Structures are given as C-alpha cells and as structure tokens.
Amino acid sequence: MAIHLYKTSTPSTRNGAVGSQVKSNPRNNLIYGQRHCGKGRNARGIITVRHRGGGHKRLYRKIDFRRNEKDISGKIVTIEYDPNRNAYICLIHYGDGEKRYILHPRGAIIGDTIVSGTEVPISMGNALPLTDMPLGTAIHNIEITLGKGGQLARAAGAVAKLIAKEGKSATLKLPSGEVRLISKNCSATVGQVGNVGVNQKSLGRAGSKRWLGKRPVVRGVVMNPVDHPHGGGEGRAPIGRKKPTTPWGYPALGRRSRKRNKYSDSLILRRRSK
C-alpha cells in the first residue's frame, strides 16, 4: 500500500499520512447490517468497554475464513476496503459460480487465480493443510480448530512461519513472537496479509479517530479519587501507589492476565514477548 503525505495546509493535515484509497462496492448478498454494534455497551446499555462509541455506520462483509471451496479455482475480481478490519478484502469468483470475500494476500492483484485443497501449489493466496506445506512457509489465516476457519494472523501485515512438523502437530511462530503447536490437519493460507503499511498512517486530527468509533482516553491521574485510584492530590500529584492500577483497582501495565491452568498452556512452547 502506498503512503501519501499531506502538505501542511491546515493544522489537521500537518504530518498527516494516509494510505492509497481503495474503493468499496460490496455485493448485496455478502453484506448485512449490525444493530447496536461496537458501542461498548451490553444488552442493558451499561458500558462494558470504555472509549468506544459513535463512528460511521458500517455494513459487515461476510469473509470466507474457512476456504472450503475445495479444488475449485477462483479469480480475484476486486480488491476492496473493509471498514471492519485494517486489511483489505478480495472478491473471488469461483468456477462453480460461487462468490466469496477473502483477506487480501500481499502482492495479489486483480486477475490472479487462487485455489484451496490438499494437493495445490504452494503459491500466494492458496489454502491447504499444514501437513502439505514445506518448512519455512509464510502463512496467515490459520485454523486452531479443524474446520472452524482461520483465527490466527488475520490483521493487516500479519504473517506466521511454519518452523517444524512432528507427529500430529506442527510448530508455528506467530506474529506476536509466540511459538505454539497446532494440528497438522488445520488449514492456512500461503503468504502475508496485505496492507502492510497501515501502521505508518497518521490520522492527523481527533475527528478522524471519532469516525472510527473511538472516543477520547482520559488519564486516571487527572481524575478525582472517586473516579480512579490514581486521582486526587494537589496540582500535578503522582499516583500515590507503588504500582499503577486499573479504574477498578486491579494491577495494570505488566501484570499477566492470562488464566492459570488453561487448556492450551501445554500447546504454547514459548510465550509472546511483551
């Protein structure tokens, strides 16, 4: 993705950087609306996730994470913007008339052909089981549970690496640095997710952040004691504690929050680096 820098004509464009525009013209049978989605509220209207609300209305695109059109070649017809994720999506026309969206692999262009199955070429955009891939293959959209669809390495620029195969399991190095075991029968897509330069974008102004449905974040140290454990004091006072905490008094910034004795602990060979 090309990054375009703004000229400093207004304060909001100063040091601004945006990606190249990709239009979106979704198919009606592959989209549907979502009511009360992304506002950070539960069914009772109570805030359960802070700093969310507003934003532009969105239509959800049905993405084919399972890639279960086996041994049927498909052609990339469009590359579109998806407001629900930072990666682009591709519209695929399969030979049997089926039309589906998939994540856009890096380097894929309109007119390329992809296929999924057990004995397919190791080329960008093709989906196949891990047992049929050579070591060192760069992959994304990786299944954890067989047949459930890809759940790992789906963000823009994400890529994992197949580093070993032994017995019924394959060893993967994930984008976070975590090394874990996954069944060799699980499927993955060859290549890296596109839109790699998304982290180089600079929104430039607060309004652009609000369009994304993200509200302002207020520091706890400037609140009152009734609102946050860090609040209170005269002037610019420190937090008054040995370690920072969340608004509800739980340890923050470094405390491990993963549950103990989780079923997947035995599958993680090396934890992600912080």
Swiss-Prot record:
UniProt GO MF annotations: rRNA binding; structural constituent of ribosome; transferase activity
The UniProt keyword set, sorted, is: Chloroplast, Plastid, Ribonucleoprotein, Ribosomal protein
Q: Where is this region: Disordered?
A: 1-23, 223-274
Q: Does the keyword Plastid feature in the UniProt annotation?
A: yes
Per the record's keyword annotation, is Ribonucleoprotein included, yes or no?
yes
Domain of life, per UniProt, equals: Eukaryota
Cell location: Plastid, Chloroplast
Instruction: Tell me which InterPro entries the record gives.
Output: NA-bd_OB-fold (IPR012340), Rib_uL2_dom2 (IPR014722), Ribosomal_uL2 (IPR002171), Ribosomal_uL2_bac/org-type (IPR005880), Ribosomal_uL2_C (IPR022669), Ribosomal_uL2_CS (IPR022671), Ribosomal_uL2_dom3 (IPR014726), Ribosomal_uL2_RNA-bd_dom (IPR022666)
| GO cellular component terms, semicolon-separated | chloroplast; mitochondrial large ribosomal subunit
Q: Name one Pfam family in it.
A: Ribosomal_L2
Its GO biological process annotations read:
mitochondrial translation
HAMAP family the UniProt entry points to: Ribosomal_uL2_B
Family as reported in the entry's similarity comment: Belongs to the universal ribosomal protein uL2 family.
Subunit info?
Part of the 50S ribosomal subunit.
> What is this protein called in UniProt?
Large ribosomal subunit protein uL2cz/uL2cy
- Origin species, per record, is Ranunculus macranthus (Large buttercup)
Give the gene symbol. Answer: rpl2-A
